[in-house]
């Protein structure tokens, strides 16, 4: 977890700008007993050179925005340390002989931060959001999709307009949001609350200041080491 600009707070992860980190350094005269009780070894404070411009992963943002949202949201596939495409929310996939269709088998038992289930319909709802609003970053990322169809609760097929060898690369950037949150919260709400499947949940956000996240206790993979 991470502390804010006035000290160390347990069970939270904070992304702060450099100015606030310097302020925190000056204010470290917290009582030793309190610091010990709050298990500071499990806290992480990260100083960034700029503030995140948006916390909705479908909205264009700066590099800091991507770094922050990556802790809260996940994609069907991702890159490993050697830049190979590997499974994430999807546990396996296959491509048709003509290169136009990709079928994904999804991991089961995953829930979004708002308690909603992750499934094929959730992926489709994210695509539909993108194609209905060209101002969103996800629109560009999914522009080549002709259709996305749920073959079952945990399997879907995405069909492209033409074979595209960058499709999976782009898919690593398509972060999946809870459809209920998309509908009920919109961009303004997603700037204040997170609704992804990632290891951290948005706890507090101060524009131009800091972002606090807490560990997702219901995370579907091995839990994060930092609170």
Task: Go through each PLM region and give its residues.
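Aromatic- and charge-enriched surface segment that lines or borders ligand/interaction sites
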Residues: 91-135, 157
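Bacterial lipoprotein signal-peptidase II cleavage site
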Residues: 2-11
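N-terminal lobe/hinge region of extracytoplasmic solute-binding protein
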Residues: 47-97, 128, 195-196
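Short, well-ordered beta-strand elements
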Residues: 41-50, 91, 101-104, 123-126, ...
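Gly/Pro-rich hinge or "lid" segments in bacterial periplasmic/extracellular proteins
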Residues: 80, 171-226
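Surface-exposed binding/hinge segments that line
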Residues: 140-182, 204-206
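N-terminal low-complexity, Pro/Thr/Ser-rich intrinsically disordered segments
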Residues: 20-45
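Short, solvent-exposed loop/turn elements at domain surfaces
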Residues: 52-59, 83-86, 113, 166-169, ...
């Amino acid at each position: 977890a991470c502390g804010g600009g006035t000290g160390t707070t347990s069970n939270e992860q904070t992304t702060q700008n450099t100015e606030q980190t310097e302020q925190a350094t000056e204010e470290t005269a917290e009582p030793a007993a309190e610091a010990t009780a709050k298990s500071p070894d499990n806290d992480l404070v990260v100083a960034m050179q700029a503030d995140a411009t948006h916390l909705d992963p479908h909205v264009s943002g700066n590099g800091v925005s991507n770094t922050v949202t990556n802790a809260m949201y996940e994609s069907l596939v991702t890159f490993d340390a050697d830049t190979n495409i590997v499974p994430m929310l999807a546990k396996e996939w296959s491509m048709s002989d003509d290169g136009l269709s990709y079928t994904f088998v999804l991991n089961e038992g995953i829930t979004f931060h708002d308690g909603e289930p992750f499934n094929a319909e959730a992926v489709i709802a994210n695509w539909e959001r993108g194609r209905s609003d060209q101002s969103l970053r996800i629109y560009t990322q999914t522009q080549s999709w002709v259709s996305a169809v749920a073959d079952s609760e945990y399997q879907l097929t995405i069909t492209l307009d033409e074979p595209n060898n960058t499709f999976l690369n782009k898919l690593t950037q398509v972060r999946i949001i809870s459809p209920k949150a998309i509908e009920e919260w919109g961009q303004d709400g997603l700037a204040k609350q997170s609704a992804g499947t990632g290891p951290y949940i948005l706890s507090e956000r101060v524009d131009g200041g800091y972002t606090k996240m807490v560990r997702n206790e219901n995370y579907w993979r091995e839990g994060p080491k930092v609170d």
